[in-house]
Every structure is written in structure tokens, then in C-alpha cells.
């Protein structure tokens, strides 16, 4: 079967996401998406794009590179991230990222009353987070500091919004709200060969115009292809890690289960060993497979001329690991 050539970019790729939401000429698209996400809780009238690369303090010199970083008209800060692969300490990373817009609000000098502007960290997740605190039936999760006894909001100016777009499975006929339409576009734009009636709202005029690959310059096409290759490699590495992890977990579980079964009874031992072994083997196998595949992805991205900062952001590798690849 002949493969259909893509007409529109994938917003799941680093290039596609930043082209649509991270450039000043397209800020109306970002504003529209944010307002659909907030659904009246917060109204964004305008944004000013800020430098997405933030350097840590003199003690850590640790950098944070955001996909999109901008400021609202009232000084509120928005960090918007697209995440395609699960990371063990992803919650920690989101919290760490939020410290940068907090610290940069402190003026130079000694006089300051510590009043802070609102900070929103928005993470769009192309995977299921499997967070125990979340309602598994929901796609959007809103996190704030609250009193654990009263469940009342303790501090309302630091918010984390996680959107598990991997769970979004509505068809075009089922799209009801602007938020639905944005999630559909985020997940499925690259699959479309023509603009559907369900996405004929005026705000999407610019989306389809900016996303049409045929209008790209040769350089933009090369950058998109490199970004698409990195995205595919990441997804393939996840699939491989899952498969290897399951195989190793099954083998280890059977071995351990049989050994324990000799002592405690074959039926009980096999059942327990399989469960524990598969869980441990899956986790270790996925971690090992992901790390090896990420090194391969990084090597290809560097060979295609992508800068080190972007490679680290996409693959999760450290600067020292990249230096070893270059060496």
C-alpha cells in the first residue's frame, strides 16, 4: 500500500509544537489554546514571549529549557511543555522548572515585599501518567497547594496543569468544545489530508496555514524532518523498551516463581514470582532500553546538525553524555 504523504506537521514533534505555539506571529493560537484550557477560570488577553532558556543561580548553574515560556499582561508566567515520553522524576522536573519564574521575579537589591505573580506550568503529555493522586478517568488534572485536612487552596498563585492527550480518543463528530478541538488537533493534525468541517472555526485558519508542509522553506523542511525522526525514534524506543521489559520480566518472574514454588508450593510461588518478576523486569528493561535508544537518537540528531541544548531537552541526556558521544 502506498504511504500517504503528510500535508500538515505533527504538533507532537518539537519543531511542530514550537512553530505553532512558540513563535510571536502565532501567539493568537497560543492564547486561544490557553483560554480553551482554562475555560473561564483565567482569561488570557495577550502574551509576551520570554527567553525559553533559563540559567540557574551561581551555585548550581543548572539550565532549564522550556518549549514555550511567556508572560501575560498582568505579569503572570506560563510555561507550556510537550512531553512525549515518561520520565521517572517528571513531577520533580515540573516543580524545578517552576522555580525559575519564581526566582526571576526577585528584584536586585534588598528591598522587596516578596509578592509574586501567578505561575502556570502546563504539561501536555503524550502518554498516560499513571499518577495515583489523579482521577484515572480524567484527561486534565489541575494541581495546587492545599491544606490536606480541609482540602482548601492554601496558595493560589502556583498551578500545575497536566493534560494526558494520549487518553483523548474523541472522533471529529464527537468534538463539542474548543478545548476538544485543540486536543484533537494536537493529537491528529498530521493525519489529516484536508481541513475537516469540525475545525472550521476562524481561529484555526492560521493553524492550517502555518502547519502546511508544502509552504515551508527548504531549511524548515529539513528541521521538521530531523524533529520528526527524533520523535519517531523516541516512540520506537518506548515500544522496544516495553517489549524487552515484558520479555525479561516474564523470564525472571518464571525463574523466581519456580524457585520459590519449590519452597512454598508451586502454585503460590509461580503466581507471586511472575507478578514480582514482571514488574521488576519491565521497569529495568524499559529503563535500559530507553537509555540505549536515547544515545542512538542523540547521535543521529547531532549528525543532522541539531544543537546540543535541543538534543538534551528531547532525549533527557546530560551534557557530559553528549560530550562522550561527540568524543
Regions picked out by a protein language model, each given a short descriptive name:
Residues 1-221:
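Conserved single-residue anchors adjacent to enzymatic active/cofactor-binding motifs
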Residues 2-6, 78-83, 173, 180-327:
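Short, charged alpha-helical interaction segments and adjacent helix-coil junctions
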